[in-house]
């Protein structure tokens, strides 16, 4: 799990761009919300917050 802060929309857009390069499911977690890391609108809704990034692989 990786922790970071989404400072602005450009950071959110860059995170989505990186997530889309991978086939695995990537979740962006903020409190009780779990957002698909490949969703621009979803990740953009978390701008200004500290988030955790979790990569879900078949290995667990």
Residue ranges and their predicted role:
Residues 11-20, 24, 33-49:
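Amphipathic alpha-helical interaction surfaces in cytosolic regulatory modules
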Residues 1-6:
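Short amphipathic
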Residues 9-12, 60:
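Alpha-helix N-cap/helix-start and coil->helix boundary motif
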Residues 50-60:
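C-terminal structural segments of small proteins and small subunits
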